[in-house]
Amino acid sequence: MSLSERDKQAVWHPYTQIKGAVDTIPIVRGEAAYLIDEEGNRYLDAISSWWVNLHGHAHPYIRQKLDEQHQKLAHVMFAGFTHESATVLCKELTTVLPKNQAKFFFSGDGSSAVEIALKMAIQYWRNKGIKKQKIIALDGGYHGETLGAMSAGAKSVFSAHFQDYLFEVTHLPFPT
């Protein structure tokens, strides 16, 4: 059974309706900016696998650094724990960013980062005792797939089915 056939039996892909799912392209590896399928066809990964692979696939330096880190520590939750790599990165960031940006919050992905930013803004004003309940975002943005991120993003075919569950956001024109 081919990879595409096995995939169709077990995987539900983003932005698809299961009954109408089409065959997927079976990617078996990546090289630099290209994805390669099981027949050796090459595809330019023009969106960096949804914007998270900006330096290409199988980059030797990144692979080396990931391997070095994985041999020391693959992961530790950040609630009550820390580790050297995170602390060093944050300290280095303080040397290149404005002085008022001296603390950093890690997130696992863009959608979660948007959710966290929304929660931080809400908590900030609540802690000050000021009742602020409006969220403002720029028109036309894509902020992710969670309900909060879809609320802040542009209304589209991706969020249409969830309109009744999204919270109110005031969208402003993008500055020119």
Model feature map: region roles:
Residues 15-16, 42-130, 136:
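Glycine-rich loop-to-alpha-helix module at the N-terminal edge of alpha/beta enzyme cores
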Residues 37-38:
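Short, acidic, Ser/Thr-enriched surface-loop or helix-capping motifs
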Residues 140-176:
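PLP-dependent aminotransferase-class I/II
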Residues 1-31, 48:
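Active-site-adjacent loop/helix segments that line or gate small-molecule/cofactor pockets in enzymes
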Residues 25, 127, 160-163:
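Short secondary-structure boundary/capping segments
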Residues 28-30, 130, 164:
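A generic fold-level signal
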